[in-house]
């Protein structure tokens, strides 16, 4: 048995030119179409999306070469392939960089399995976190999952042993652009930030301030921040407690979470596409 982890440079921009040709079926799309969450906000998507699609095409070609190699070695039938990534890209629409925010374009990522027990085509309607990958692969290989391992196996849903959604919430930790934490439920996105901490030097904080609340059911593109809405104060209270539980389960101390205030309102709202922080 073997375990091989391959990380590709694409779709990072390794030079200053968008010289990756987009796939034929995509290359004309940016001229007349832009995903609503990107097109509604300021950013660099109109300039870079075509080249980004071209780099995604390179990844697809690289995955094809891996499959060809497994076939030539006679190993494809006994190998599980997993395709995923660590984050998405929001093209400077949410902050002054391309990632590291609580928004779907940054945290919602592809995850595909092929081979072994992952037979047939299908889509799993279950929220999955990257910490679920290790227990899932162990379970798929018939190896007992250690009781103290973070995450949970999704194999019961893959094997159709259950079809009931777990109701699990996704916990997000953000660094380098901010000392931030967030939680994503089926309907809500709730994010907090340690406004006085250095995101390069500080890994966490005993205190955070609310920054974002999105109703994903009615606002899937996250264009309306409800964090200052009086009508949603109870929602914030419930989500704050859920977030604290996620943090303690991850080994962090339970923090104090301060409500978003009028004093820092300008600081909190600039993320809706503004580039001057």
Where is each model-derived feature located?
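Active-site-proximal cap/lid insertion segments
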Residues: 1-130, 140-148, 199, 204-207, ...
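Protein kinase-like catalytic core scaffold
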Residues: 2-4, 80, 170, 189, ...
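Short, solvent-exposed loop/turn segments at secondary-structure junctions
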Residues: 8-13, 87-90, 97, 118-119, ...
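Non-transmembrane alpha-helical segments in soluble domains
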Residues: 53-56, 60-71, 134-138, 142, ...
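Polar, surface-exposed loop/tail segments
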Residues: 77-79, 121-183, 232, 237, ...
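C-terminal, low-complexity/hydrophilic appendages and adjacent surface loops
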Residues: 101-106, 174-228, 234, 263-269, ...
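C-terminal helix-rich "cap/oligomerization" subdomain common to oxidoreductases
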Residues: 239, 243-257, 266-272
């Amino acid at each position: 048995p073997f375990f091989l982890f391959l990380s590709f440079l694409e779709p990072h921009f390794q030079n200053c030119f968008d010289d990756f040709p987009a796939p034929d079926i995509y290359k004309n799309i940016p001229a007349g179409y832009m995903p609503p969450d990107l097109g509604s906000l300021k950013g660099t998507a109109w300039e870079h999306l075509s080249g980004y699609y071209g780099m995604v095409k390179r990844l697809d070609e690289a995955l094809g070469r891996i499959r060809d190699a497994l076939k030539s070695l006679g190993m494809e039938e006994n190998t599980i392939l997993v395709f995923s990534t660590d984050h998405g890209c929001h093209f400077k629409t949410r902050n002054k960089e391309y990632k590291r925010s609580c928004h779907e374009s940054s945290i919602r990522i592809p995850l595909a399995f092929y081979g072994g027990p992952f037979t047939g085509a299908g889509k799993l309607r279950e929220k999955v976190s990257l910490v679920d990958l290790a227990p899932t692969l162990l379970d798929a290989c018939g190896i007992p999952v250690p009781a103290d391992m973070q995450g949970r196996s999704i194999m019961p849903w893959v094997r159709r042993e259950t079809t009931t959604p777990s109701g699990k919430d996704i916990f997000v930790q953000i660094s380098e652009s901010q000392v931030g934490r967030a939680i994503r439920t089926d309907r809500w996105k709730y994010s907090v930030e340690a406004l006085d901490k250095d995101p390069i030097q500080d890994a966490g904080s005993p205190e955070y301030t609310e920054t974002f609340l999105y109703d994903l059911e009615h606002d899937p593109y996250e264009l309306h921040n409800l964090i200052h809405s009086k009508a949603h104060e109870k929602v914030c209270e419930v989500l704050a407690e859920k977030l604290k539980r996620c943090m303690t389960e991850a080994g962090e101390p339970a923090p104090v979470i301060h409500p978003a205030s009028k004093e820092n309102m300008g600081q909190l709202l600039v993320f809706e596409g503004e580039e001057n922080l």
